[in-house]
C-alpha cells in the first residue's frame, strides 16, 4: 500500500484533480496477508507455531469471514528472515508451522485457504505442513522420516490415520 500511496501522491502533483484508487497488491511473500485482509475486509489473527528451525514463532494470518477463507504467508511461519544466515540450510528447515496455522484457521471455521509461498526458508515439499495436519510420512521400516528435506528421499508410505477430521469436509 505504501508504494501505491507514493504513486498517488506523485500523480496528484501533476494533476490534482486525477482520480487515483490505491489497491493492495502482493506477490505471495511478506505483505500478502496485509494486502488481502485490507482488500477483502478481513481481520488478522496471531498464533504461536513451530518456526522453520523448530523454535516457537508468532505468525500473523488473515481471515475473510464472508468466505470462511484464511490468508496465510509461508514467510510468517517458515520464513527465510526467521533463520540466521549461518543456519540457512533447507535440509533442516520445516513447514510444520504452516500446517499449525492452517489447523488454527480450521478451528476458527475456515474451509478455504490462500497460502502465499514467497519468502520461505524451506524445501520440504510441504511434508512438515501435512505432518502438522496429521499425515504420517514413513520410511521402508514404517518409521517416521526425518523432518525437513532430509527425509524426503526416504518416504515410502503416507498414512492419514491421524488426519484432523475437518479435512474430510
Label each residue range with its predicted role:
Residues 5-82, 149, 167-169:
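Glycine-rich nucleotide/cofactor/substrate-binding loop typically near the N-terminus or early
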Residues 1, 26-29, 117-124:
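Gly/Ser/Thr-rich loops at beta-strand to alpha-helix junctions
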Residues 2-5, 52-55, 135, 154-157:
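Short amphipathic alpha-helical surface micro-motifs
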Residues 2, 6, 93-96:
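A general alpha-helical scaffold signature found inside nucleotide-binding enzyme cores
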Residues 92-96, 100-116, 121-168:
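Glycine/threonine-rich beta-strand-loop-alpha-helix active-site module
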Residues 33-34, 84, 125-130:
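Short acidic, glycine/serine/threonine-rich loops at helix termini
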Residues 56-121:
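Anion-binding (especially nucleotide phosphate/pyrophosphate-binding) glycine-rich loop
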Amino acid at each position: 500500500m505504501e508504494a501505491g500511496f507514493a504513486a498517488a501522491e506523485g500523480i496528484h502533483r501533476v494533476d490534482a484533480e486525477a482520480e487515483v484508487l490505491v489497491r493492495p497488491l502482493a506477490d505471495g511473500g511478506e505483505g500478502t496477508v496485509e494486502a488481502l485482509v485490507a482488500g477483502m475486509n478481513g481481520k488478522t489473527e496471531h498464533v504461536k507455531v513451530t518456526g522453520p528451525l523448530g523454535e516457537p514463532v508468532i505468525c500473523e494470518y488473515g481471515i475473510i469471514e464472508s468466505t470462511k477463507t484464511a490468508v496465510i504467508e509461508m514467510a510468517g511461519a517458515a520464513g527465510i528472515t526467521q533463520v540466521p544466515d549461518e543456519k540457512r540450510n533447507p535440509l533442516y528447515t520445516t513447514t510444520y508451522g504452516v500446517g499449525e496455522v492452517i489447523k488454527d484457521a480450521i478451528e476458527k471455521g475456515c474451509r478455504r485457504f490462500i497460502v502465499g509461498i514467497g519468502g520461505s526458508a524451506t524445501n520440504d515439499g510441504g511434508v512438515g505442513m501435512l505432518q502438522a495436519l496429521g499425515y504420517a510420512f514413513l520410511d521402508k521400516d514404517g518409521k517416521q522420516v526425518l523432518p525437513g528435506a532430509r527425509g524426503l528421499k526416504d518416504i515410502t508410505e503416507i498414512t492419514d490415520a491421524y488426519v484432523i477430521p475437518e479435512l474430510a469436509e
